[in-house]
């Protein structure tokens, strides 16, 4: 006698059919169009991804003001460690406030001070709630909680269905476990710590059977700018866990040491990135710089999408996903985003990913079958110049492996920058918002204009504490 389908099976089947019928949600397309229409004409360029690929990012505030590090650069205020955390429901309300602007599969940073200092059950509840809103939460952390508390990451993965994590590692941090990490003065000296995180993340995924997209962040100062070279070499040197890095030139905000902020330009940062990826070849480095894209104002962020090719016996090689605008294949990438902007595979199972791909093909068979094969052939030729069939055979045999890598820079502003003409233009085009008292506020305003400090002061008063209260109760 045939068995009846379980409710779970029926839900999965409905999900597959839904994705096949609508591979890009109408809500996502509407948000993209709204954001594109709101851009000034001079920012509607081929490099512009806002309103084309995505709809920006949101972050929580008050999730855990406390941090157990004492970094040289920090956006938190002096009183942060004496401020009580927001209740879980208040953070959930922030997520609801962000959802209309982020859309389905919207990027949400679960952040504040060090969120992993909250009770695990509360972090898990926040992760679960974000998923219920169709947001994709990325847990922002220094990572040492995972080193000190075995099993914590595994709980987040299995009970909270954590799918994205970002671990901050650089020489500006103070408070690491391990003497070698505490006394490191160069970024290269922290590469063993980065290796440790790779192993930790690999083990957690193997133990739980859950996949985790991992990013790493690095604060960039005048002191460690040259260390970008060592971090990039490590990143492409063979590790297979971190597929995104965010470089953040330091701003003079919060409790950052006086005079420590500023002094690192985007041009200086990106030249070091491109020079490392190109092996010092100036022409190749310049070509990589021409492959950058951005969201909103180009002074706020820069992004380079690519893949790293690993071939036995050869040095790893980075290839930009979107060729420079002069390349004939750049038009294929641009057309893909025009047709399928807003498409997201981030929360897909294998079945829904296949259904989504078929759904895209059914909507534009001429493009998918007519142009994408040529683009794929172009990629094979890049992987093995003059011998694309050999590249295909090597991919099939495993002699050639490829891994995606996204390189990002986020350029937050100090208070003096916010008052300039460009600063005002950047605020008007901000793509990174925090919900504060019912209003979405630019992260730069939150950190540089005292918004965070005032928010924390309100939290303290609501909890019956003063900002200068030193009682342990305020840490809860």
Residue ranges and their predicted role:
Residues 10-151, 155:
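Conserved alpha-helical substructure of the radical SAM core
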Residues 173-181, 242-268, 284-311:
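Flexible glycine/acidic-rich beta-alpha junction loops that bind and position SAM and/or redox cofactors
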């Amino acid at each position: 006698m045939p068995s009846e389908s379980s409710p779970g099976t029926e839900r999965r089947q409905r999900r597959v059919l839904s994705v096949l019928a609508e591979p890009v949600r109408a809500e996502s397309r509407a948000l993209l169009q709204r954001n594109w229409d709101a851009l000034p004409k001079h920012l509607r360029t081929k490099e512009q991804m806002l309103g084309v690929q995505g709809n920006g990012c949101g972050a929580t505030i008050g999730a855990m003001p406390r941090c157990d590090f004492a970094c040289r650069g920090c956006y938190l205020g002096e009183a942060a460690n004496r401020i009580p955390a927001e209740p879980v429901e208040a953070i959930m309300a922030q997520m609801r406030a962000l959802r209309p602007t982020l859309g389905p599969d919207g990027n949400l940073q679960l952040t504040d001070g060090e969120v992993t200092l909250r009770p695990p059950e509360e972090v898990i509840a926040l992760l679960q709630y974000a998923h219920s809103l169709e947001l994709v939460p990325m847990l922002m952390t220094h990572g040492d909680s995972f080193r000190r508390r075995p099993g914590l990451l595994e709980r987040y993965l299995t009970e909270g269905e954590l799918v994205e994590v970002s671990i901050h590692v650089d020489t500006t941090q103070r408070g690491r476990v391990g003497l070698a990490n505490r006394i490191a003065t160069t970024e290269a000296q922290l590469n063993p710590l980065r290796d440790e995180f790779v192993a930790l993340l690999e083990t957690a995924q193997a133990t739980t059977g859950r996949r985790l997209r991992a990013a790493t962040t690095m604060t960039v100062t005048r002191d460690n700018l040259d260390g970008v070279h060592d971090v990039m070499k490590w990143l492409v040197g063979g590790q297979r866990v971190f597929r995104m890095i965010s470089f953040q030139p330091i701003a003079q905000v919060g409790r950052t040491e006086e005079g420590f902020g500023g002094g690192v330009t985007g041009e200086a940062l990106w030249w070091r990135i491109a020079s490392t990826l190109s092996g010092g070849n100036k022409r190749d480095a310049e070509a990589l710089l021409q492959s950058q894209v951005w969201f909103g104002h180009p002074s706020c962020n820069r992004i380079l999408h690519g893949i790293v090719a690993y071939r036995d016996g050869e040095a790893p090689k980075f290839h930009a996903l979107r060729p420079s605008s002069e390349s004939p294949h750049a038009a294929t990438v641009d057309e893909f985003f025009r047709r399928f902007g807003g498409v997201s595979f981030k929360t897909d199972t294998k079945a829904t990913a296949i259904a989504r791909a078929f759904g895209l093909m059914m909507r534009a068979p001429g493009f998918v079958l007519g142009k994408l094969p040529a683009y794929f052939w172009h990629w094979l030729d890049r992987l093995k110049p003059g011998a694309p069939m050999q590249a295909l055979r090597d991919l099939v045999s495993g002699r050639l492996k490829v891994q995606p890598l996204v390189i990002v820079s986020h350029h937050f502003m100090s208070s003096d920058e916010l008052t300039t003409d460009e600063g005002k233009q950047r605020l008007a085009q901000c793509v990174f918002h925090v919900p504060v008292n019912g209003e979405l506020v630019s992260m730069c305003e939150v950190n540089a204009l005292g918004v965070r400090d005032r928010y924390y002061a309100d939290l303290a008063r609501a909890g019956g504490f003063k900002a200068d209260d030193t009682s342990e109760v305020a840490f809860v």
